[in-house]
Design a protein with these regions (language model features):
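Conserved donor-binding/catalytic core segment of Leloir-type glycosyltransferases
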Residues: 4, 189-216, 229
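N-terminal strand-loop element at the rim of the active site
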Residues: 7-13, 28-75
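Donor nucleotide-sugar binding/catalytic pocket of nucleotide-sugar-dependent glycosyltransferases
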Residues: 135, 141-187, 257
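Glycosyltransferase donor-sugar binding loop
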Residues: 200, 227-242, 258
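Aromatic "clamp/platform" in nucleotide-sugar-dependent glycosyltransferases that forms part
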Residues: 280
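Short hydrophobic beta-strand element within catalytic cores of glycosyltransferases
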Residues: 297-301
Length: 375
């Protein structure tokens, strides 16, 4: 099957985060099964000529251009817009990782106009909004593509309710739950040396990286040799993180290495004794799945989409707010507790979030979409 995946942005800083990681994981697994899969996206930070593949996946990348002061939503590319129709006509199924932007929406509209089966995956990015730009895009395009898609993939019941609210009326009638999958990782040795606590996600307000810095003194009181890593592309919180590090006198204990590529991310996760993601209302974070896949116990908040799974499997700890982070980390640093949580984390990802099962479900969706388009 010929499948086109469209995602907003692939950059050297990995600024678009989880949706790109999900798209690449799916593309790689589909290619392993013999399917002809291609990726299209904007590109930023690369030297010319732009890469023609990403992690082994053939890619048609277009230099990002900012046309509106709206974050990722204000980026586009004339060449991508001009070539969208040709790209979708070459595919049997078009899979769009949909956001309210000037990349994925035009590709989705092109697929509908070309009569190609359209599968949408929103990653929690399309929810009810009072912003004028969101309301305009919803009226002009978002509702149209959601209603016209052969399938709309959602992660959680909360996300589905949001999508129904955006669509209005009776809501979606072609919704399919598809969890994020994570590739299997070989079991490695437990991390050695002093405790190492990791945060690796975008540095933005909702993800609350400062909360980990605030938890550091209480952890250091019990483990004075511990170190902390706050990694990820800056989306407005790096200055606040650095300011808090200075205020608490933690410059020798907390490092901020910036964005991590896929290989470095895996390396850092393996070196970490505990992975902490303090974010609120996080739909289904790939970084937490990746941490558990290598056996690193996690600390997440109770509004995290994976909180129930983590709690039930005892693959880490779930906290209600910032004050719970330090006690949770200290608990997981106990040798026997960490060993148990590490084994549980690997078991959870292998049994519940394995790529084989996720891709099997996705291929069923593709087959139904393609067959329906031929009827």
């Amino acid at each position: 099957m010929r499948v086109l995946h469209a995602v907003t942005l692939h950059s050297t800083t990995h600024a678009f985060g989880g949706p790109v990681r999900v798209a690449l994981n799916l593309c790689g697994s589909l290619r392993e099964r013999g399917h002809d899969v291609r990726l299209t996206a904007l590109a930023d930070g690369f030297r010319r000529p732009l890469p023609e593949e990403v992690e082994g996946v053939p890619a048609r990348l277009h230099q990002a251009r900012r046309v509106l002061p709206l974050g990722f939503s204000g980026l586009t590319s004339p060449s991508l817009l001009a070539g969208a129709r040709r790209l979708v006509r070459q595919a049997d199924v078009v899979h769009v990782h949909l956001a309210r932007d000037l990349v994925t929406l035009p590709v989705a509209l092109a697929a509908l106009r070309a009569g190609r089966p359209l599968v949408l995956q929103t990653h929690g990015m399309v929810d009810p909004s009072e912003r004028l730009s969101a309301r305009l895009l919803d009226a002009v395009a978002v509702r149209r593509v959601l209603r016209g898609a052969a399938a709309v993939l959602h992660l959680t019941a909360h996300e589905l309710r949001d999508l129904d609210a955006v669509v209005g009326g009776a809501g979606l009638d072609r919704a399919v739950r598809l969890v994020n999958g994570v590739p299997a990782q070989p079991e490695g040795p437990a991390p050695e040396g002093p405790p190492r606590i990791l945060y690796a996600a975008r540095l933005q307000a909702r993800k609350r990286p400062v909360d980990l810095v605030d938890a550091a003194p209480a952890i250091l009181a019990r483990h004075p040799e511990a170190t902390f890593v706050v990694a990820g592309p800056d989306e407005g919180e790096l200055d606040a993180v650095r300011r808090r590090i200075d205020e608490l006198g933690l410059a020798a204990k907390v490092s901020c290495p910036g964005p991590l590529d896929a290989a470095r991310m895996t390396e850092e996760l393996r070196k970490a004794h505990v992975y902490v993601l303090p974010s609120v209302d996080e739909p289904f974070p790939m970084s937490v799945l990746e941490a558990m896949a290598v056996g690193t116990p996690v600390v997440v908040t109770d509004s995290n989409g994976l909180a129930r799974d983590v709690d039930r499997a005892a693959a880490g700890r779930v906290v209600s707010g910032p004050d719970g982070i330090a006690p949770a980390v200290l608990d997981l640093l106990g040798p026997s507790v960490r060993r148990s949580a590490s084994a549980a984390a690997r078991k959870l990802t292998a049994e519940t979030f394995a790529m084989d099962a996720v891709v099997g479900t996705l291929l069923d969706v593709y087959e139904r979409a393609y067959t329906g388009s031929q009827a």
